Amino acid sequence: MAETATIARPYAEALFRVASEAGNLGAWSELVSEMGQIAANPDIKALADDPNVPGDKLGDLFLSVVKSPVNDEARRFVKLLVENNRLTVMPEVAEQFHALKNAREGSSDVEITSAFPLDGQPLNDLVAALERKFGRKLYAKVAVDPSLIGGVSVKVGDEVLDTSVRARLAAMQTALTAV
């Protein structure tokens, strides 16, 4: 949703500046990701949208669920989100924060979808090959989709490499019906 992204951008940029100045992007990245996951929870969303829940209680409740250590800057950030009725955009803030971190580090996220579970050495080999192809460090998120039949589908940014059997069958069908 473009509107959510637009609303979240200044929050993500401000939080990224604070994390950069503190010099611990790794710890901040973990904290922001966790806060994004918590804010995406339907129960938290319902509380955030409930006008009968006081803001200070909502902020305290939200922070009590966070397992990572929460510093004063993060507490103030959550308070700011709650005061501006923006806690529900935290998942998008986390996504944009992560994108800013990746841009700074010259890395990217890669979404790998496989027909079968992929882990261990085969996953490491695939990620290494993809890092050579894209020329940057990649952080893999792996999903399983049996409908691929075989092979993998890889998404890095807006680039997609689909070597799945399903994609090959679709290409054959297109070629055969075009005649």
Curated annotation (Swiss-Prot):
Write down the InterPro entries for this protein, in alphabetical order. Answer: ATP_synth_OSCP/delta_N_sf, ATPase_OSCP/dsu
User: Gene Ontology cellular component?
Assistant: plasma membrane; proton-transporting ATP synthase complex
Subcellular location per the Swiss-Prot or TrEMBL entry:
Cell inner membrane
Q: Which domain of life is it from?
A: Bacteria
Q: How does it sit in the membrane?
A: Peripheral membrane protein
Sorted keywords for this record are: ATP synthesis, Cell inner membrane, Cell membrane, CF(1), Hydrogen ion transport, Ion transport, Membrane, Transport
One Pfam family named in its UniProt record: OSCP
The UniProt GO MF terms for this protein read:
proton-transporting ATP synthase activity, rotational mechanism
Please verify whether the record's keywords include Cell membrane.
yes
Quaternary form? F-type ATPases have 2 components, F(1) - the catalytic core - and F(0) - the membrane proton channel. F(1) has five subunits: alpha(3), beta(3), gamma(1), delta(1), epsilon(1). F(0) has three main subunits: a(1), b(2) and c(10-14). The alpha and beta chains form an alternating ring which encloses part of the gamma chain. F(1) is attached to F(0) by a central stalk formed by the gamma and epsilon chains, while a peripheral stalk is formed by the delta and b chains.
Q: What does this protein do?
A: F(1)F(0) ATP synthase produces ATP from ADP in the presence of a proton or sodium gradient. F-type ATPases consist of two structural domains, F(1) containing the extramembraneous catalytic core and F(0) containing the membrane proton channel, linked together by a central stalk and a peripheral stalk. During catalysis, ATP synthesis in the catalytic domain of F(1) is coupled via a rotary mechanism of the central stalk subunits to proton translocation. This protein is part of the stalk that links CF(0) to CF(1). It either transmits conformational changes from CF(0) to CF(1) or is implicated in proton conduction.
The UniProt entry's sequence similarity note says: Belongs to the ATPase delta chain family.
> Know the name of this protein?
ATP synthase subunit delta
User: Which species does this protein come from?
Assistant: Cupriavidus pinatubonensis (strain JMP 134 / LMG 1197)
Q: Which gene encodes it?
A: atpH
